[in-house]
Amino acid sequence: MRKPSITITTAKAIITPDYTLIKSHSKYQLPSRFQKLDADSPERSTVVKLFYRRFMRLKPFISNVKMVKDTYRDYVRYKFMKENYELKRYLVFNPDGLRSKIKLELLSNTKCCERILPVTEMQRTLEFVLKSCSYLPETKAQKWDIARDNTYCRQILKNLLTMQYEKYRSILHRGIGHDELDVKFSHLKTTSSPLTKLNKTEKKKIPLFKVFSDFDTTLIYLNETLGTRL
């Protein structure tokens, strides 16, 4: 027997068994215009908090699965509080033989509060996540091209969170430290040591490092194409 269809209407949303329609979008969208800020700008902390709150408010719409929502929450926190994206990008675009030790040291030692705030990229990333949370049926009557764009965003975000969850599992259960993957980005650095000189634990890391390296490299190139900071 088919379940009865129930619609709940509140001041902020219309809720059905399948979908939620948000009436007011101001909590999730940004003011119409931003400009890049210097590291020393007094407005920096205000803008960071503004973005952070909006990303976190989208958590309930990411998935119905608690594990996925928790992974999204942890990933947003990491992006805002710990990730050295410029170091990660440098490792991807500069093969091992072309890397400057001085440049690597400079990037590695730069504190989060000293980095230029990429407001344009952050805004595009927020738009990307908003699209991934928005649903339109893929029919000509419902603007097929927009619906398909939202579907692509949703699928990419799902894959990103799946891979991030695998990183968390590797950190917890497979002897790989958090600093190796998310701070030093060891999986993006090739080792010159032959396999015979590696211990058993280090040998086990090689297949995982290869998977994470391929994914993060692809993600960096995707960000370069879309102008995002996923």
Curated annotation (Swiss-Prot):
Keywords: Sporulation. GO terms for biological process: ascospore formation. It comes from the Eukaryota. Belongs to the IRC19 family. Involved in sporulation and maintenance of the mitochondrial DNA. Is probably involved in a pathway contributing to genomic integrity. This is Increased recombination centers protein 19. It comes from Saccharomyces cerevisiae (strain RM11-1a) (Baker's yeast).
